[in-house]
Amino acid sequence: MAKSHEIELSPVVDSSAILAILFKEPGATRAMELIGNGLCSMVNLTEIMTRCVDRRLSPEFADDVIKAYSIAFADHDEDLARIAAGLRSATRHKGLSLGDRACLALAIRENATVITTDRAWADLDVGCKIEVIR
């Protein structure tokens, strides 16, 4: 009898998980365990860089963490734009931003689990698995 093997897909990484590692916030340890070889939206990279600038750091401050965890970045193309726009009505009541919806759209398209620290996502039913790490 053949043994079934579950294939582990790379997670989609929300900016909040990377920021938790960068700024030693709650959830950082769990993020370090989960985000390796993950995929992140370019929209979320903008959020990460912006948060660095807000803290008077260079936008490149996150580069070492991104490289250490082999995070790849996906362009926010027309396909993702349409998915993210379609998520608006299902996420508006939670106050999700464009960046949040871009992340979820990527996870939906890639059939992947999202890693986030955002508790507001915990009970969303949008077509992808969501793991809240804080």
Specify the residue positions occupied by each region the protein language model found.
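Active-site neighborhoods of divalent-metal-dependent phosphate/nucleic-acid chemistry enzymes
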Residues: 2-3, 74-113
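Short, well-structured N-terminal submotif of metal-dependent ribonuclease cores
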Residues: 1-40, 52-64, 134
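Short secondary-structure capping/turn micro-motifs that flank functional sites
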Residues: 68-69, 82, 100, 122-124
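Amphipathic alpha-helical segments within well-ordered protein domains
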Residues: 49-50, 66, 85-88
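Short active-site oxyanion
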Residues: 8-9, 35-38, 70-72, 108-113
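Ligand-binding grooves and catalytic loops that recognize ribose/phosphate and carbohydrate rings
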Residues: 55-60, 71, 76-81
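Alpha-helix capping/helix-boundary segments
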Residues: 17-18, 44, 80, 102-103, ...
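Acidic, PIN/NYN-like endoribonuclease modules and their adjacent C-terminal/linker elements
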Residues: 1-8, 104, 108-134
